[in-house]
């Protein structure tokens, strides 16, 4: 796969570093574009903040989708506090503040350069999450391929697009996307809040554009804390249609911005107006001040 300009097709065993090198349009970049082209431009030239949630999500993805690569990509830092002693053989009150502790950590980090270092608690949490996924939704990941990269040219705009699919089950013709979440009971809200409908449609259409039959897009969401609740289901057709309309509008806007090389920010309203939810409970406009005061006095 050419890092800078990959040809349309489906790629397996493509590293994340290789994937992000391409400037092809991808789903995650469409979220800042929906705010404004200026936000898209900034997003495309600046690295995304690597939050604790993102890091743990990557760890869980690796544990569920590519468990054979865990040892190569991650290592657990031992509890060096047990090894730290003073010259008289006693234990210091604060082992982490000692020179010996810092030297042990520095040596360990040097020996494991290139791997992400985890605390024992992080590893145990990942194992618990992965066990929950396997117990409740393991059938989704029994056959297929992980981290499938898809590259295609959008027929309408001509733009090169790309996607990295968590899991593709070729036999059952489905894409599965794994999400970690704080509350799986509210995942329907996340579908709209984080534009997951757009992601589902974008990925389905991308794989189809490469000549593959695919019928369903599943989300499997797992809570990142005990008891690690799991929910999994395919998206309904209406959700896919809504997501398709959303990404089509975004791609058309992106194509126009690239063509003109103009990246405008927000447009301003003619006047600031309260949203409907903020006006609820206010009766001044219809009842007048006297009736409002009378109502509140009676309460």
Predicted segments, located by residue:
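Metal-dependent nuclease catalytic cores that hydrolyze phosphodiester bonds in DNA/RNA
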Residues: 1-162, 293-294
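Metal-dependent nuclease catalytic regions and adjoining charged, substrate-binding loops involved
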Residues: 3, 202-299
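A residue-identity detector for tryptophan
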Residues: 16, 123, 152, 167-170, ...
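Short, charge-rich amphipathic segments
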Residues: 124-147, 175-188, 267-274, 278-281, ...
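Mg2+/Mn2+-dependent nuclease catalytic core
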Residues: 145-245
């Amino acid at each position: 796969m050419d890092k800078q300009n990959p040809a349309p097709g489906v790629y397996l065993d493509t590293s994340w570093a290789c994937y992000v090198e391409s400037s092809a349009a991808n789903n995650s970049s469409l979220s800042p574009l929906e705010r404004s082209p200026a936000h898209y431009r900034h997003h495309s030239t600046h690295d995304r903040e690597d939050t604790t949630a993102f890091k743990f999500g990557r760890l869980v993805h690796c544990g569920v989708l590519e468990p054979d690569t865990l040892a190569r990509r991650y290592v657990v830092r031992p509890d060096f506090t047990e090894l730290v002693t003073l010259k008289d053989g006693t234990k210091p009150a604060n082992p982490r503040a000692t020179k010996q502790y810092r030297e042990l950590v520095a040596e360990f980090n040097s020996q494991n350069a290139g791997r992400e270092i985890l605390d024992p608690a992080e590893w145990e949490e990942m194992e618990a999450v992965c066990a929950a996924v396997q117990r409740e939704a393991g059938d989704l990941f029994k056959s297929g391929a992980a981290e499938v990269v898809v590259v295609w040219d959008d027929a309408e705009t001509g733009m090169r697009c790309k996607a990295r699919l968590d899991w593709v089950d070729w036999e059952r013709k489905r894409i599965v996307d794994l999400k970690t979440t704080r509350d799986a009971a509210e995942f329907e809200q996340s579908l709209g809040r984080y534009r997951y409908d757009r992601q589902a449609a974008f990925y389905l259409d991308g794989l189809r554009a490469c000549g593959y039959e695919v019928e369903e897009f599943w989300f499997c969401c797992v809570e990142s804390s005990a008891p690690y609740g799991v929910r999994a289901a395919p998206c309904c057709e209406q959700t896919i249609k809504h997501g398709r309309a959303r990404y089509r509008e975004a791609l058309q806007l992106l194509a126009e911005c690239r063509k003109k090389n103009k990246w405008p920010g927000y447009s301003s309203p003619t006047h600031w107006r309260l949203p409907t939810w903020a006006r609820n409970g206010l009766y001044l406009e219809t009842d007048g001040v006297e009736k409002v005061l009378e109502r509140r006095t009676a309460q």
